Amino acid sequence: MKRIKAIYPGSFDPPTNGHLDLIERGSKIFDELVVAILRNPEKDPLFSLADRRKMLEAMTAGFDNVSVDTFDGLTVDYALRVEAHAIVRGIRAISDYEYELQMALMNRKLQPDVETVFMLPAEQYSYLSSRLVREIAQLGGSINGLVPELVEQKLREKMDVAHKFANSEPPEGTTPSEGRKKSRKKKA
């Protein structure tokens, strides 16, 4: 009997309980599920690729048929490289559907043997996105229940560092914004 392997691609910056919900349900549908973290040089992520991978590996440690990997390039090409038969995509709203439908049709054109499987999140996660979680955390709001505890802890650590940096005194002889720009360049 043919084993069905799927990938669940995304930036996962940060991983949320909505992602975990789809991973859990996807692991019941597919024989093997690869959570594939996209390395996108066009984006400036909050968490490094290594941090996101560690968080997702911790979140999925209880699933025997789930692994975590990173990739760059076209998702369908990655699917072929790892011999996956399907791409799992979460759909929260009509706006997600319109975008994901276009991507699925293009992926089918590029690689007809790779199917896209749309999954709806559990109702309590239908509004949840990594972007919203980041915004709430940056503004000091509660993200309890939106992300696993490990992710909440990592987000709080990031926000504490960012808050301390934002409130630090600039180097002598510079304006506050110039001082921050120079500090950022030194870290890069």
Feature locations, PLM:
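Nucleotidyltransferase catalytic core that binds NTPs
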Residues: 1-188
